Every structure is written in C-alpha cells, then in structure tokens.
Amino acid sequence: MSSSRPAVVPKRRVLQTTRLVNALLFALAVAAVPAAAQQRGDGADEATQTLDQINVTGTHLRRVDAETASPVVVIDRQRIEDSGQNTLGQLLQRLPMMAGFQTGPALNSNFSHGRALVSLRNLGPERTLVLVNGHRMAGPASSVASAPGVDVNAIPAAMVERVEVLTDGASSVYGSDAIGGVVNVILKDTYDGFAATADYAQSTHGDANRRTLGLEWGKTWDRGGLIVGLSQNSMNPVFNRDRSYAAKAVEYLDGQVSEVRGANTRAFLTDGRVLTPVDGVAPGPVGEEAFRPYNRATDSYNVYDAQYLITPIKRTNASLHGSFDFTPIVQGYMDVFWTRSKTVSRLDAYGLEMPDAVDNYYNPFGDQLDAYYLRSPQANTRVYTSTMFQTNVVAGVRGRVDGTSWQWDAAAGYARYKDTLVRTGFSITSALNNAVGASFLDSDGVVKCGAPGAVIVGCTPINVFNPSDPATIAALRGTQRPVDLIDESQMRFVDISANGDLFKLPAGRVQAAVGLVYRTNKFAQGTTSDVAAADADGNCDYNDGCILKQGREESVREAYAELLVPLLKDVPFANVLNLNLGSRYSNYDAWGNTTNSKVAIEWRPIANLLVRATGSQVFRAPALGDLYGSPYNSVIDNTGDFQDPCTGFTGAPNPACANVPNDGSFTNTAQFNVVTSGANNVGFKLKPERGRSYNVGLVYDPDQVRGLSLNVDSWRVVLDDMLTGVGYQQVVSDCFDGSEAAFCPLIQRDATGQLTRVSVPFAYNSGKVDIRGYDAGIHYTLADTAWGTFATGLDATFFSSYRFAGDPHNYVGENSSWGNMPRWRAVANLAWDNGPWHASWNARYLGRTVNGSQYENFCVDTNADGSCAYFPIGSVVYHDASLSRKIASLHSTLAVGIDNLGDRKPPRFYSYSNAANTEASTYDTLGRYVWSRLRVEF
C-alpha cells in the first residue's frame, strides 16, 4: 500500500462488535446513500475534484489542501539523496523537532545494536509513533536486549519516496504512542526499469568505511505494477582511541581534568598493602615475590582503549510493492519489507572479585590475603553480537463506491521484530567460583577443587595468581559460555476503513472517515542457554544477567471516526473556515479502555493565510515489557549508598517500617534482595499515560513573492501519569513519606524489621510533565532563472519549557537526567538545479546548553572546593554539501558529498557523557565524512 495513490487511502481500522462499532457501521451505511445521490447530481466537475484529493498524515480524511490543521514536515526523495545516508536514522535525528536520548550506532556502550531511534519533543522514542505507509512497525517490547522504540534504520532507505513528520499529538487518529507526534515513511509504489546503485564513504581520518550495493526493478502494467528492491550495506568500526577527544575517559574532579582509569589485578593484604603481579613471570605457581606494590598511576588501564566509538554493522534489506486492479474501482495491493542487521559492541575486560581466593591452593599469601581482584584482558574482554530481523507484511483490497466519493480499504498485516544478543567473555558463575575458590593438593598429587572428602567433581582449580600464564587464560575461558538473549515482538492486525462525503452545506461538503482495527501484540523473551535462564526472582548461574523464558500477548480493539465540517466559505474574513473533529476508542485486554478525541480549526481569513489550532487527547499504553518484563536480582548490603528511612525510627506505625521498633534504636544491618521486574510480576498496577496536545499556528504564502512560504506554530504537550523508571531507594522512601502508597506492598522485612526483599517495577506512573515550545519555517523557491532553479529553507525549534508537576525548575538549556536540551535547534538548506546538475548545502545548528543541572543536583564534576561544577556548552554548527550530475548517455547519476565540512569535534561533557566524553545522541562523533554514489539505470 502507498498513500501516494489518490484513488484509495490506507488507514487505521478495527474489528469489534460494540455499540460504538455498530454506530459507526450504521453511520457509514446511511451516509453513503445521500452522498451517492449528491455525487450523481453534481456532475463531472465535482468528480474530478474528488480525484485530486490526497491523504495527509495526521488525518484519515482525503484533502485537496496539502496544508491542514496538522503541522507536517515533509522530507522528499531529493533531500534523502542529498544527505548521502543509506539509512534514515541520522537524517531524521537531525530534524530540529527531535531531541533527547536518541540511540544510534555511535552509542556503543548503550548497546544500540545499530538501531536508530527518534524522539519528538524529547518525549522519548516510545512516545513517537513510527508508521510505514500508514501502518505500525514492531519494535522491542522491553528494554532487556535493547532500548524500546522502533528502529528507523530497518526501513530500506533506497525504497523510500518521502517521510512525513507530524509534530502534533495524534492518538485520536492513530492510537497509542502518538504523543510527541508521528513519523510516517512512504515507500515508492511505481518504477519502470532496472537500476543498480553503489555507494562508498570514508572519514578523512581514514576509517568508518561504508559500502552500499543496491538493486531496484519495477514494471507498470495497465492493471497494476510491481517494484522490488534489494540492498546491502556495511560500515567499519571506529575505536575511541581513533579520535583525540575520545581516546581517554576524562572527568573534572576537584577543579582538575583527570583521566578515569580502570584498576588491574590487585591483591589486598591484611597489613594494608596492595600488590599487583609483576610482568614476565614464568608459567606455573608463584610466590609472593611475583608481586610488587600497586601503583594506580602506572598499573591502571585506559577504559576506552578497546571500546568502539562507532559500532560495525552489516545490514541487508529487501522490499516489494505490488498492486493489481481487479476492476476499474477495486484494487489489491501488497507491501513487504525485510531487514537483517548484525552489529558488534565491545567493552573492556571487567574485574572479577574472588571472595574465596584465600582458600585457593595457589594463593602465595596464605591468611594474609584479605581480597583479590582479577582482570584478564586476554580472557574477559566483553563482546556483544546482535543479530536483528525486522519483517513487515501488509496485504489488502481497496476501492471506491461507484458514482460516489466514498472509498474503502480492508487490509491485514503482520510485523515482527527479533533481536538475538550473544554475549561472550562471561563465565558460568558456579564454574568460576568453584575453580578459583577452595582447592587442595590431594594424596594422588593432583590439585583438586573443594576440600578433602568434599571434592567438587568436574572442576579444575585455576591459578588466578599468575594471570598471564597461558594455562590460566585457557582455564578462565573454559568457565565461559557464549549465551544468547532473545527479545521478540510480533504484531498482527486487521484494518477496515472508509471515507467520503456525507452531505453538502453552504460552505462545502461534510466529509467523514470511519474505521475499525483489531490488533494483537505479542512478545517473547528467553535464551537457549540453561545457565542464563532465570527463575521467577531473576536468579541464574551466569555472571552477566539472566532472562526469564516467557511469552505474553494482548489484543487491542479500536474504532474511530473523523469529521470535517466546512462552516464558512468565501465570506468577508473567512475565505475558508473548517471544523475537524475526531475520536478513537481503544480497548486493551491487558488493562482496560480509553477514548481520545480531538478538535481542530482551519481558518483562512484570506486564501493564502492559514490559521490553525488543534487540541487533542493523547495516551500511551504500558508496553508488554513494562508489565511482564524478565526479572533480575541484586543483593544490597549496608555499605552502599542505600539509606533506610526507618533508621532511628521513633514515629507512629509506618507501612515502610513493618516490625521496626519505634524507640530510635533500629539500624538495618542485613543484606537484602532487590528484584526488578515487570510491574504485573511484582503485583504493581500500571496505568496508561494520558495527556493533552495543543498546537496553534499559521502558514502564509504571500502573493507578492511567489514561491515563498512562512509558518510558525506554538505547541504544548501535557502528559499525566508519565511512565518512568524507579529504583529500590525510591520505593522504600516514597512509601515511608506517603507520596506513593502503592510501593508499600513491595517492601518485605523480617520479624526484627531487617529488610529481606524490595521488589521494583520496571516503570511506574510518576506524574505530570509539561513541555512547550515553538516551531518556525521559511521556505522559498526561485524557479526557472537563467542560472537554474534555487530552493532554500530554514526550519527551527525553540524549546521554552520542560517542567514537572510540583517542580518549579525549567530543564530546557541543560544536559540533565532528562537529556540534553539546547533551547534552539535549526536546519537550513539550499538546493540548486540546472539541467543535469544538482547541488545542495545544509547547515545544522545546535544551541547553547549547560553541562549538568544545578537544580536537581545532577552533579558529577566538582570544583577545587568540592562544589558542583557546571560547564556552559557553546552552540555548534555543522555544514554538509553535495553535488550530483545526471549523465544521460550512460543512463546514470553520479553524486559526491561531504558531511561536517569543518571537521567539527563534539564538545566535551566530562563525566556527564553517555559515550566518549560527549553527548553522542546530540553531536557528530565521526568528523568530516566524504561519500560518493553512482546510480545506473537500464
């Protein structure tokens, strides 16, 4: 299906026998009769106007006007090609209305898996709905393997016709998740011929080599058409050490810039000495002389040395679009795309605490050994290999009611996302603990695990006190096992919709759209490895996390209706005045139902000035991962940062302090378990997020300057019951102070008041967020001059407010725990066409921000006096350019381009960084990048 075909329009629909559904069907049947009569009586001119109607993202109605009450930014095919990108992620993330945590290939340490997520209004990828030809894509249902949100890099960019970005809440139109807005990717639906495309790119540092090969074939017949695409692309990695700003992890501590280094192998003795192995020790058992005093300056290691700055990736895309006209008014269609991607993330070797090493046979220190930490880069470098599959299939039939304006569409679809993350460099916990723990020399002269009379069968002791011994390295590897972690989501849906004219008013025809949707969402998690399979509390025998084998499913039934009522036309001060109403009912068997509606006004006081206003209700349903995600367990002792609010308790009975004496004598001294899991797993009830979205703006196309268009919009999103993460400290504290009574059943204490367990849901409804700002754009096209055609544009977003209920602070202009939010973001572009030549220039502006938030005490860096240090980050401008020429004699197009012309380095964020000492989801980490592309058509 492609929404670029005017005859039929794909929409969101539903299948449920309810009063609302019956009412919609009755309205559709009744409305079609007068509409048909009116169409027959109005003549051929009216029919021709109907054919000119198109669908616009943000409404189910077909419109003649491209500009409606919904603010939509369009990225056309030429702009995609000018970017030089072979995926959509970076292009979309650079739009000024995108902000906040947007995962991309530059986030190695956050395990992006090569995915690219988009976040409108800094509301998070989970609150930006991504559609392909008007239909939802599937993404991970939980954050166990990767961050939630749809991977826009999985969409085959070579087959994209355009991208429409709706910057307004649209739950009344599309349902859940459309809070910040909607990204609707429209795929090509027609092409005649065969084309081959080759792309190569490389940074001027000589790395990040990118290669793309693509094939495209299409054929159009009298009654249909077919277009098929296949592409493969890959990109080499870039290490942190390959960029000066990222070569070492740095912090600003006590007024000085210092390197953050990791500790190597160390032995802590009871007399206070800290020792480390000397180099060049012969294989075999060692004595105390094989160790020397540990010097942090020389014996520590660079934590960034082995880490990727840009993760390597290989991706294969295949796509198909086909259509067939069964009759002049009925058409069948199918859209399929499939993506496979493979990425690798690397982290340095981690240190292993050996609590029982004092009883190891090879211990040269005897009882003097207090603690031993082993770090083996040869054995414990961590590698994460992710293989992802994304499949989307939609098939349907659409048509029109002959002699009327009514069109209908019936479609069924399937979407699947699967991510298999294989972890290497980690040990089976019991195997490692047994091998490095207690051991002895048996009477047969063989060193064995355990103790005399209690030998651990199948275990060979490891001499961890000679970590460079090849036998030690091999033995450590022998305790390891590659373990997979599988996260899969599936979605099946049936959509039925219709739209057309109801009746005629003096100002024009009243249009309606109705639809029904039935959808099932399913997610599954698990592993093929028995050692990583978790029990109900998240425990397993693997030292890099466990996962519960499980599957869950929910069904969704929805119905919607939308009306466009023309109120005035061709009267003084009202060339056009339209009222747009819409409502959508959604029923989730997992938690209940909700109805979300919108009211929009389109007013043209004169023909070339549009004043628009929209008020919409929005919502987001809790994801299945939020409800049922796999648990994980941790043990907390009284030496950490946890502060029990019941310490010294003397007040009235408090549910957080069950069994705690109130005489002021209590102190929690016991270790306790923290089980973090899906909310339903721990008996915690989640509510959907609900809110409102507002937009007021104008679009002006002055007659005095042909080709000029100006727009400005004021927007606001108010979100109640926002789902956010929570920690065990907050669970206990919020129960104690009464701010969240629902947390109290999650706290368990023994008969003496000592904590035994705290259950923590993945998410909870934290409260209200209120976000406000402005969008503005200026676009001008100067066509058919002696020097060619010029087109220029500027789009900008101004964040004015990002606040939470009960919190007076404005987080805009800060890099805080809510993300990096420059107040200004803008993109300017200039394009030139003259015959076979085309050139483009693009500038990206990121406004000033502050490193850290003084208000929320988000303090990591410190001044000499110990006070928090906050650094102003200046504005950054990136310039990109491209040039292409069509060579008619060779049926080809050659294009070259440069991104980040000035080789601008990202600003330094010290300890506030999410990767490589900077904010990688905001700034360019690669540097100057040169690309070329050749397309040949046959």
Q: What do the predicted segments below correspond to?
A:
Residues L579, S709-Q854:
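Gram-negative outer-membrane beta-barrel transporters
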Residues S2, D720, S800-S801, A843-C859, ...:
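C-terminal beta-signal and adjacent terminal beta-strands/loops
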Residues S112, L117-T167, A195-A198, A513, ...:
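Periplasmic plug
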Residues T190-G193, G206, D222-R223, T327-V330, ...:
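Short loop/turn motifs that connect adjacent beta-strands in outer-membrane beta-barrel proteins
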Residues S142-A145, N236-L253, L275-I313, S319, ...:
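Surface-exposed, low-complexity loop segments enriched in small/polar and acidic residues
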Residues P6, L117, I428-S430, S616, ...:
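C-terminal beta-signal and terminal closure region of outer-membrane beta-barrel proteins
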Residues M1-L95, G214, G218, P328, ...:
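N-terminal Sec signal peptide and the immediately downstream disordered periplasmic leader
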Residues R40-E46, N55-F111, V132, M137-S143, ...:
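N-terminal plug
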